[in-house]
């Protein structure tokens, strides 16, 4: 490429960066006006925003899974709004502002990517991930526990996967992924045994104890199954979401066909419902 070509690319890059900075500045100005002039926005706190933030993150997740580009852009904006919201509240309280948030982010990204910003070498993504966890622990003076960064309120499937993945980072993992199936079968057997004990319980106290044990064994079985998915490179959360979507499609088909036929699901036998369900399945729903 000629020198003038390189110069033109540089000018275009600066123009794009200027556009992004102006949009960011405009977003901050809108946030400032909302906090100053809108009663609802003025009334919000970190605590009141939290459930709405979770909802926005799930809506973003849906947009990603469904590959809805226009909706993805919208949901990213909604999540970004919440980041500005929390930062503005902190600024009003004299704790920090959005600049501090961005500076902290940049500081962390630079520190945890020495293979990009210094002379450290990383052969592949696996090595990058291992280095990331080591640097994260070093930030806390080496006293940070491996699983301490996993939020208690994290959805349980993701929490289990994250725990297993972090344990893998220090070598606590199956040497051969095929060996995990013995654990899955073992946990399934223990779960079935407790269910049988629950069925045979002769008193409320006995049933309560058996139910508690069965619940614990169910958790162990699910944890082992999630571990198996991880070892084979599968995302258990995505897999379960796909199963839920499939069930929704087929059940909706069953419900809508029943309505068109002038019938009510409550009055149908399981065999009648299964017939329509199999029809939905045959249609690829």
Residue ranges, per PLM feature:
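Flexible "arm" and connector segments at domain edges
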Residues: 5, 10-75, 81-218, 223-285
């Amino acid at each position: 490429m000629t020198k003038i070509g390189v110069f033109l690319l540089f000018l275009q890059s600066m123009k794009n960066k200027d556009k992004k900075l102006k949009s960011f500045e405009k977003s901050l100005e809108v946030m400032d006006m909302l906090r100053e002039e809108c009663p609802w926005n003025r009334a919000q706190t970190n605590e009141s925003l939290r459930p709405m933030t979770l909802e926005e993150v799930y809506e973003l997740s849906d947009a990603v899974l469904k590959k809805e580009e226009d909706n993805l852009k919208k949901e990213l904006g909604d999540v970004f709004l919440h980041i500005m919201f929390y930062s503005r509240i902190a600024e009003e309280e004299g704790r920090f502002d959005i600049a501090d948030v961005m500076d902290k982010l940049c500081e962390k990204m630079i520190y945890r990517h020495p293979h990009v910003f210094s002379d450290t070498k990383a052969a592949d993504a696996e090595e990058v991930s291992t280095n990331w966890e080591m640097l994260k622990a070093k930030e806390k003076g080496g006293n940070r526990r491996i699983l301490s960064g996993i939020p208690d309120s994290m959805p349980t499937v993701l929490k289990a996967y994250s725990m297993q993945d972090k344990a893998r980072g220090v070598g606590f993992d199956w040497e051969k992924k095929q060996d995990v199936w013995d654990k899955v079968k073992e946990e399934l057997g223990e779960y079935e045994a407790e269910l049988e004990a629950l069925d045979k319980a002769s008193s409320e106290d006995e049933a309560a104890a058996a139910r508690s044990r069965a619940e614990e064994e169910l958790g162990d079985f699910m944890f082992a199954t999630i571990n198996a998915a991880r070892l084979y490179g599968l995302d258990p959360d995505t897999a379960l979401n796909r199963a839920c979507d499939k069930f929704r499609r087929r059940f909706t088909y069953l419900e809508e066909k029943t309505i068109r036929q002038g019938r009510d699901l409550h009055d149908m036998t399981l065999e009648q419902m299964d017939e329509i369900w199999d029809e939905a399945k045959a249609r690829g729903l």
